[in-house]
């Protein structure tokens, strides 16, 4: 037996009744909301926006609601003329005017929602009302908790079949409401589906002014609601026993009914010898009882075991009552789920002695039973109106008993009919019964056809369509309305509205028909030819559907899929964060970018520039529109000025808000218990009244100027969206930066990964002739984003197979060439997807491409992109990023309860994990060494957080006494293991001959120091004749060079060039070899040594491939060191390409190489090409901006001008890097400059021949 608990938690509270002011809303449908159930209710976009607008001050953080509210301008009174007209014509209720021009909730309603939330929290937590109020006074109410309102049933639409009157007739109409909360919202681009959670009952209390708390300030859509939180049920055990008995009988009756009904349906499919056990195991069987059930109820007036022939030919399916009950029981999957959930709740209550049935559970079972089982709405309303608990218990038992009796009578009547029809009736009587059934069905169908609502004549549908406006705002000359569109220039209205029996068509075609009829004429981004092609395909679909065999042919399915995809594209739907272009908040956008990413000022500048251009275009467009309207008004005929002015006013007002015509939707199925489709009625009526105007604008080619339908969300067509490529090493934030850009602009974001794509059809789509053809990735991205101006990230564009990558299959096309049209601002406004077959405007899409090695791309594609290079981060930047972004994110991801407070939203994170700067710097240098980005750095921080999460849980479980949130350097080996080898091993040691330090740019985007080791062997020593030929240099076969270390072809060629240049220096007698000899002897000695020298050069870390020309000067200096037998100082690193004339050419990756030199403790001086100083000036200015300091633009200009001189005088750049990295910078324009920096000039070069150096200078 179950245990009963009459003392609920609510009884501990001293005051269980409250009166609060709540916003109210009256449904348009006959839906009745019972507490404890979640309802999915479908609204038109306008109605949903009007309802949510009342809470706009509390839901500003919910993006989907903000996007919906941006479609309508409820602040101005001239934007909803047609909505006002339709509401007055259809609703005819003064209390519904607030849905036309809604207002925000009053302060009294705000306090009412707070008080209700406090009471509700106290009841949920079991702490009582008083403790619940105290505990929630300082807690912030979440966004969706504010969406609390009182739902008033629509009594006019709930009919009582016994009295044939509505529930609102008479003076005894109930004042009971359902207090509900909006807990979910889904935007399907046509309608809005709100999920309502019914919480409790309430009673409307008339505000007579005596109550000072609610004396003033209430609005027409607000009401004082009395709520009783007392859930004490007298004689709980007895009442639950009665409810349990009735529910068992009812569930057995339903289960047996479903079994018999399915047997009747499956008569032609199943063998007549199948028994009830097999039927219980069929798919979709809503079986509630384990084992067989032989009765509908306890009524035994019929035969429990009828004849097998009679049972196999059951006439149950001919009974209208049986059909109605069956459709309600198995008509939707959501009902199945709810039905099984109700059964599970009852089984949990009655199983075991440890489970306690309390008052709240019992009352919830009462409401759930009424809400889920197939009771009519007038009975559900009656149960809702039973505010007293005892009366509610009596009513639910009576309702269940009536339903049990209905199932019993149905079985008795069916058994009688089966027995008579199969055993006693003659063939003539059977035929008569069947004929009467068919006649009744035919009469019913004829009645349904006659009673169908007559379509209004759109040419005479009221003021909204009496004077349709053309696209330029002008009104056409008056003419008889019957000949309004018979000029023949663009066809007739029958092209879009030529089917008066659209309701008789296929259910699958209704949504397509609504799109063709109502939405397609209003699409401004489609040309007339494109609309003609779509309309032609639609006619083919209708012809195929109406042909013999229906839609069974393949052409029908291909065309239907095509039209469904065309319908799903968000035509003319533009989403933005700002109300209008002129209202763009540049500071807010800049703050959003700064909050998401550190540094990257050059990228942020480009986006701010784009927003500034949009803002200026919005301001100028408003001025131009005002001037144009004034000029048109002055040029009009004065006799028609008044009417034209009114027409223009209406046209302008409609252009400021998104037309609800686009909100027409096909009926959506119910989600949990009931989905209310009648909420879209107003939107459908509005679409009908404006259909004629839309068709006129779509077909009339009067003006080519596009007038935006919603100035607040549609960007200017005169401005092309930027097409940016972010080029940089992995892990530098390119992908996340693209997401931040979309967030700053308030646009939807879509990512397309292009890595490995080798088929052109992936970009352009497949032609419809192929089986399973689909649009390309770009059209699919538009469908997913639900707007025509998203931010689309083309990730890894340099890894597209094709173009310069090689290996492309000619039969599949070149996908990189297909991107040329997409990424060209002058062409992408007419991008043609092979599947669609007509142009699509992509000019408002912001394309952001990412690449690691952009030079792998084809030159035409690279020329179309605005490339912004993102370099590697130095460890100071990584330190700031780790403290400000990565560590707080990892702490939150690993489950620590951090509160978002403070300047950087770090909250109380130091209570859980605290890492000082030295420890974090050690993680960067020792555990993520050589990384250009911060990806591995974040992984390491995540590892630290996971270790600390384990310790924190052990402390919570009291397994350890204390929890220490601090992580110092000594803890890193415990958590992260042994650090990586530093890589400085090869650079350590004493100064050696032929050992020179070079700088490299690694494939991961980082920089490092490479050691070039050269050893020379004099062949004269091995032959024993060092003084061969008296030192005239004529002996030997020339120097030989052998290079190892997995070197590339370009690097090996640079080494040979360097060696040849050393030889040219010997021939020109520039080098000094022996101070005791004259110049000629000096040259002969050097040449003789050179010709008998075998040089072997090796670059350590042989497993790593190395290539590039930037090591030319390094290898040349190494060879010269071996030849002159002079060591090179170990604190110098250099980079630069060398030519045969000794000129040092500029190289790339200077910043990364500078960082690599800085991370090596032995390097104090760095030699770079002279031409690379301008790169250092650029990096210097960028570093100043990213550090947040004010950049002196006059100084930058002075630095650039000073750099043009051979001997520059301004050294701010060198001083900056000396202070920041501890590296002294030297510049070399030719190889002789390197010799002067490394060695003493007098020791290496001959003074007599110094003047000859000018011959080789450039």
From Swiss-Prot:
Q: Does the keyword Ubl conjugation apply?
A: no
User: Where is this chain compositionally biased, Low complexity type?
Assistant: 270-285, 641-655
Q: What is its EC class?
A: hydrolase
Xref: Gene3D superfamilies: 1.10.8.60, 3.30.230.10, P-loop containing nucleotide triphosphate hydrolases
**UniProt KW Repeat keyword:** no
Q: Where is the composition biased (Polar residues)?
A: 459-474, 656-670
SMART domains the record matches: AAA (SM00382)
Q: Which InterPro entries match?
A: AAA+_ATPase, ATPase_AAA_core, Lon_lid, Lon_proteolytic, Lon_Prtase, Lon_prtase_N, Lonp2_euk, P-loop_NTPase
Q: Which GO terms describe its cellular component?
A: peroxisomal matrix
Give the Basic and acidic residues compositional bias ranges.
484-495
Q: Write down the chemical reaction(s) this protein catalyses.
A: Hydrolysis of proteins in presence of ATP
Which HAMAP family does its entry note? lonp2_euk
Write down the PANTHER family for this protein, in alphabetical order: ATP DEPENDENT LON PROTEASE FAMILY MEMBER (PTHR10046)
**Protein name, as recorded:** Lon protease homolog 2, peroxisomal
Per the UniProt record, the source organism is Candida albicans (strain SC5314 / ATCC MYA-2876)
């Amino acid at each position: 037996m179950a245990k009963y608990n009459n003392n609920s938690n609510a009884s501990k509270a001293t005051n269980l009744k409250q009166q609060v002011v709540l916003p109210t809303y009256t449904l348009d449908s006959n839906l009745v909301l019972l507490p404890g159930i979640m309802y999915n209710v479908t609204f038109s976009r306008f109605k949903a926006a009007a309802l949510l607008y009342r809470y706009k001050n509390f839901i500003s953080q919910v993006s989907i609601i903000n996007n919906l509210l941006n479609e309508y301008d409820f602040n101005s009174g001239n934007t909803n003329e047609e909505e006002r007209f339709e509401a007055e014509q259809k609703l005819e209720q003064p209390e519904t005017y607030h849905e036309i021009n809604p207002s925000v909730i009053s302060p009294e309603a705000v306090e009412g929602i707070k008080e209700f939330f406090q009471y509700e929290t106290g009841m949920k937590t079991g702490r009582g009302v008083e403790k619940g109020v105290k505990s929630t006074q300082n807690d912030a109410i979440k966004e969706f908790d504010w969406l609390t309102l009182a739902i008033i049933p629509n009594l006019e639409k709930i009919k009582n079949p016994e009295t044939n009157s509505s529930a609102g007739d008479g003076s005894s109409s109930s004042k009971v409401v359902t207090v509900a909360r909006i807990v979910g919202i889904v935007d399907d681009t046509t309608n809005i589906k709100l999920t309502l959670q019914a919480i409790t009952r309430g009673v409307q209390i008339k505000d007579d002014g005596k109550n000072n708390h609610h004396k003033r300030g209430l609005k027409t859509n607000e009401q004082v609601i009395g709520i009783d939180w007392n859930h004490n049920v007298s004689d709980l055990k007895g009442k639950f026993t009665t409810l349990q008995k009735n529910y068992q009988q009812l569930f057995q009756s339903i289960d047996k009914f479903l079994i018999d009904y399915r047997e009747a349906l499956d008569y032609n499919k199943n063998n007549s010898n199948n028994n009830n056990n097999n039927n219980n195991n069929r798919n979709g069987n809503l079986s509630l009882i384990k084992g067989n059930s032989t009765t509908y109820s306890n009524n035994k007036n019929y035969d429990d075991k009828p004849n097998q022939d009679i049972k196999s030919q059951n006439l149950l399916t001919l009974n209208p009552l049986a059909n109605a009950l069956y459709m309600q029981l198995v008509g939707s999957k959501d009902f199945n789920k709810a039905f099984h959930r109700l059964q599970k709740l009852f089984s949990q209550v009655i199983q075991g002695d440890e489970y306690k049935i309390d008052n709240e559970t019992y009352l919830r079972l009462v409401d759930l039973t009424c809400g889920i089982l197939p009771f009519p709405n007038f009975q559900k309303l009656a149960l809702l109106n039973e505010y007293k608990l005892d009366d509610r218990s009596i009513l639910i038992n009576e309702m269940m008993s009536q339903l049990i009796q209905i199932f019993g009578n149905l079985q008795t009547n069916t058994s009688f009919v089966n027995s008579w029809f199969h055993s006693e009736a003659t063939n003539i009587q059977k035929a008569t019964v069947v004929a009467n059934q068919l006649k009744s069905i035919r009469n019913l169908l004829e009645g349904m056809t006659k009673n169908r609502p007559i379509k209004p004549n759109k040419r005479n549908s009221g003021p909204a369509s009496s004077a349709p406006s053309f696209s330029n705002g002008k009104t056409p000359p008056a003419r008889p309305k019957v000949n309004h569109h018979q000029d023949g220039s663009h066809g007739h209205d029958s092209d879009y509205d030529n089917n008066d029996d659209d309701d008789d068509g296929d259910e699958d075609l209704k949504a397509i028909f609504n799109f063709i009829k109502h939405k397609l004429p209003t699409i401004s981004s489609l040309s007339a030819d494109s609309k003609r092609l779509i309309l032609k395909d639609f006619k083919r679909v209708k012809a195929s559907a109406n042909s013999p065999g229906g839609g069974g042919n393949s052409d029908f399915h291909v065309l239907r899929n095509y039209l469904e995809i065309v319908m799903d594209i968000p035509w003319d739907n533009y989403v933005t964060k700002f109300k209008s272009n002129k209202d763009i908040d540049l500071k807010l956008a800049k703050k959003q970018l700064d909050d998401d990413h550190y540094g990257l000022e050059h990228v942020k500048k480009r986006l701010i520039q784009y927003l500034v251009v949009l803002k200026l275009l919005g301001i100028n467009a408003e001025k131009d529109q005002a001037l144009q309207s004034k000029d048109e008004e002055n040029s009009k005929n004065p006799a028609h000025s008044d009417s034209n002015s009114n027409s223009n006013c209406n046209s302008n007002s409609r252009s400021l808000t998104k037309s609800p015509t686009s909100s027409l939707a096909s009926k959506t199925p119910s989600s949990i218990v009931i989905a209310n489709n009648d909420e879209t009625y107003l939107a459908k009526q509005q679409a009908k009244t404006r259909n004629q105007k839309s068709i006129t604008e779509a077909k009339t080619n009067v003006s080519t100027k596009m007038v935006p339908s919603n100035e607040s969300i549609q960007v200017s067509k005169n401005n092309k969206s930027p097409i940016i490529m972010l080029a940089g090493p992995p892990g530098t934030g390119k992908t996340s930066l693209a997401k931040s850009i979309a967030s700053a602009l308030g646009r939807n974001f879509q990512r397309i990964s292009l890595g490995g794509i080798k088929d052109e059809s992936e970009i352009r789509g497949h032609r419809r002739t192929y089986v399973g053809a689909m649009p390309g990735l770009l059209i699919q991205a538009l469908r997913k984003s639900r707007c025509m101006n998203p931010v689309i990230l083309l990730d890894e564009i340099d890894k597209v197979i094709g173009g310069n990558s090689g290996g492309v299959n000619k039969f599949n096309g070149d996908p990189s060439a297909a991107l040329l049209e997409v990424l060209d601002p002058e062409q992408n406004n007419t991008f043609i997807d092979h599947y669609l077959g007509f142009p699509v405007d992509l000019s408002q899409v912001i394309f952001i491409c990412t690449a690691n090695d952009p030079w792998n791309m084809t030159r035409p594609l690279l020329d179309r992109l605005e490339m912004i290079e993102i370099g590697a981060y130095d460890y100071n930047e990584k330190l700031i990023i780790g403290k400000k972004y990565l560590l707080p994110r990892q702490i939150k991801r690993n489950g620590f309860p951090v509160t978002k407070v403070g300047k950087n939203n770090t909250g109380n994170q130091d209570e859980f994990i605290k890492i000082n700067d030295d420890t974090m710097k050690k993680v960067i240098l020792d555990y993520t060494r050589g990384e250009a980005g911060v990806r591995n750095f974040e992984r390491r921080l995540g590892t630290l957080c996971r270790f600390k999460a384990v310790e924190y849980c052990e402390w919570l479980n009291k397994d350890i006494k204390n929890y220490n949130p601090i992580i110092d350097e000594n803890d890193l080996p415990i958590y992260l293991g042994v650090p990586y080898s530093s890589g400085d091993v090869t650079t350590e040691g004493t100064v050696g001959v032929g050992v020179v330090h070079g700088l490299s740019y690694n494939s991961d985007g980082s920089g490092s120091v490479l050691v070039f080791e050269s050893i020379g062997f004099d062949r004269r020593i091995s032959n024993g004749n060092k003084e061969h030929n008296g030192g005239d240099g004529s002996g030997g076969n020339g120097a030989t060079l052998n290079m190892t270390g997995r070197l590339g072809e370009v690097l090996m060629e640079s080494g040979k060039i360097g060696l040849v240049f050393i030889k040219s220096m010997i021939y020109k007698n520039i080098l000094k070899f022996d101070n005791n000899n004259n110049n000629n002897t000096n040259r002969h000695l050097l040449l003789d040594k050179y010709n008998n020298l075998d040089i072997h050069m090796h670059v350590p870390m042989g497993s790593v491939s190395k290539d590039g020309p930037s090591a030319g000067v390094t290898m040349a200096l190494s060879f010269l060191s071996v030849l002159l037998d002079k060591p090179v100082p170990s604190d110098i690193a250099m980079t630069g390409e060398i030519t045969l004339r000794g000129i040092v050419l500029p190289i790339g990756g200077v910043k990364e190489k500078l960082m690599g030199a800085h991370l090596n403790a032995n390097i104090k001086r760095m030699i770079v090409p002279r031409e690379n100083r301008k790169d250092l000036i650029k990096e210097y200015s960028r570093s100043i901006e990213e550090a947040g300091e004010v950049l002196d633009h006059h100084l930058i200009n002075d630095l650039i001008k000073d750099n043009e001189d051979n001997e520059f005088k301004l050294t701010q750049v060198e001083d900056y890097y000396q202070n920041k990295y501890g590296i002294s910078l030297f510049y070399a324009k030719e190889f002789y400059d390197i010799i002067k920096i490394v060695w003493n000039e007098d020791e290496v070069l001959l003074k007599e021949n110094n003047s000859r150096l000018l011959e080789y200078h450039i």
